[in-house]
């Protein structure tokens, strides 16, 4: 598992959650990934940025192998409609570009599976919660999210919030 994040703290967290290699940018990851995969590149590339830009698509497709899949989960602006990619390589290498939200599955099917993984200790949800906030401090949570200080921040509601 290769994780790419400009935030050093988040790269450290990625290693704790199972990443074997981390890089600060897609550009800095290309050469090591070529070496690591003997030029084959990644079967699956998942773009999960907070503010998706069309320019990320071509970089991510560069990291994607022939017949591989690049999945976009990050949300961009509805006004950002430009995506740059090499159509020749995209077609000739038979790559797939897929949009995705919430894993693309059915919540009725996937939720019981995820709960089972959580109960068995294989899905580490509690460890991903780095900070809890009261409703009164929701703005602090939002600021911490924008500053890259959390893996996940959680708003804890109390009876007084109702």
State what each model feature region is.
Residues 12-13, 17-96, 161-162:
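Glycine-rich cofactor phosphate-binding loops and adjacent beta1-alpha1 units
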Residues 27-28, 58-62, 104-162:
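C-terminal hydrophobic helical "lid"/dimerization subdomain
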Residues 93-100, 123-124:
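Short, local alpha-helical segments
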């Amino acid at each position: 598992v290769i994780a790419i994040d400009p935030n050093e703290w988040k790269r450290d967290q990625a290693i704790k959650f199972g990443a074997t290699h981390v890089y600060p940018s897609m550009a800095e990851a290309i050469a090591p990934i070529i070496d690591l995969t003997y030029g084959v590149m990644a079967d699956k590339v998942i773009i999960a940025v907070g503010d998706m830009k069309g320019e990320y698509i071509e970089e991510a497709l560069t990291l994607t192998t022939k017949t591989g899949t690049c999945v976009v989960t990050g949300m961009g602006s509805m006004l950002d409609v430009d995506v740059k990619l090499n159509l020749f390589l995209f077609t000739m290498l038979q790559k797939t570009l897929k949009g995705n939200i919430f894993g693309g599955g059915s919540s009725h099917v996937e939720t019981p599976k995820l709960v089972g993984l959580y109960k068995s200790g294989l899905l580490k949800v509690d460890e991903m919660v780095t900070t809890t906030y009261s409703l009164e401090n929701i703005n602090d949570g939002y600021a911490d999210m924008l500053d890259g200080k959390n893996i996940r921040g959680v708003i804890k509601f109390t009876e007084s919030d109702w």
